[in-house]
Structures are given as C-alpha cells and as structure tokens.
Amino acid sequence: MRILISPAKQMIPDPDSLAPVSQPRFLPEAQLLLETLRQKSDRELQSLWKTNDALTAENIQRVRTMDLTRNLTPALFCYHGIQYQYLGPSALEDAPLAWLSEHLRIGSGFYGLLRPLDGIVPYRLEMQARLRVEDSRDLYAFWGDRLARALAEETDTVLDLASREYSRAILDPLPASVRVIRCVFLSRKPDGTLAEKATLCKMARGRMARFLAEAGQADPDTLRAFDGIHWEYAPNLSEPDRLVYLEKPSRPGTRPAFEW
C-alpha cells in the first residue's frame, strides 16, 4: 500500500532539525525544471505563478539562488499547508514516522514524486502550471506516465488522498493492475445536498494520514474505523474503491468545523 497526498504552496525550510535520509528520485528532472524557470523573465514568472508582487519577489529570489543539493529539509517537514498542519509530522513518534516514510508519497509539480524524508528546498510550481518544458506543452505532458510507473514499481494498491490536480498526473496513468482506493469527504450544505469542501478535505486528508500512521496499517477495517474528530464512515454511500466519510453534525451549542 502507498498513500498519495498533494504538496502545499506554503513551504518553510528547516535544515537544522531533522536531516533528510534520501534524495528525490527525479532530481535531474527537477534541475531541468529549475533551469527552465530561470530562463523566464520576472513578468513571465508572475504570470505562471499567478502571485501578488510580494510573493512573486520572494519566489523569484528562490529561483535565482536555489541549490537543489544544499540546505535541504525533509519533504514532510517542509510543507506547511492545512493538510500538513493536521498531519502534524513534528509531533509524531518514531514508529509512525517510520511507517509514513515507507508508505506515504507526495506528488509535486517540481519534484515529481517524493518520499517523506527526501531532502528538498522550497519552490513554487503547481502541477497545473502552464510551463512549457522542451517539447512538452505543460507539466502533465512533461511528467507523462513516469510518476505512475515509479509508483507501480512500489505497490499494487494506492490510497488516494490527493487533490484531482495531482491524482490526474500520478494515478490516472497507472496500469489496470494497480488498485486505487479513493477517500471522499463530504459535508452537508444548507440545502441538504452533499459536497466536498476544499478546506475541510485538506483537514481530513491530513488527519487520515496521521490516523493510519499511528495505527501502523491501512487495511480496510482501519480505513473504515477513521472518524477524524469531525468525520464518520458512510457505508451506504461507499463502494470498495470509493470510501465516503460524512462530516458529523455539530453538537448543540458548538460551531461546525466549517461554515458554508
């Protein structure tokens, strides 16, 4: 079993805490992407990133100075988005962290596919960015099926906790022999319909990854047992390869986890 999650835009380097234990598998490809970014003008980079002036200036400085072999932070500890806050890697004990190191994989537009303790530097490049790289029209074309092939070498079952942006690049090209199990987190809207809410899904995916790490397994019974504080498994809405979790109704006098 491998668990796939998305990266986060917010990244904070911390090379002085936990040392990386491995380097990204697709480091040469990342170096090529970096060289491609360095060929862009400041205005072209801002258009590519769709960032404000302050973020653009910060990331231009990164592009101009970054070294993919120095001042590295383990990937799991470098990302600081909502999903990673709810996963809470810095609070994990050794056994759950070791379990994640083996079973968790992080999709990345820049690095391709990362293990939790691969050493990385902060970057800004989403998988959906329209970056032409050599003869490839965008990053989906650039990565092609190589990320799927790398994942298929490791496992015959993938738990999909990634956003569609990354599952499209990594899971869609998988061979039919690899089983993909998707977790869906639904909330009830005021009109009674069920829908995914991006912020809540990020929270739930992070909590799910932590739950599995602390359990030390990701078998069907463990997946169904996940409640994640605000979630409960919905067997009547689920299928073998599509596990649905519903947001629990708020108790009287308390606020919901998220308001529509």
Which sequence ranges carry the predicted segments?
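Short hydrophobic beta-strand segments
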Residues: 2-6, 157-160
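Active-site helix-to-loop segments that bind/position phosphate- or nucleotide-bearing substrates
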Residues: 4-91
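Internal, well-folded beta-alpha domain core
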Residues: 89-254, 258-260
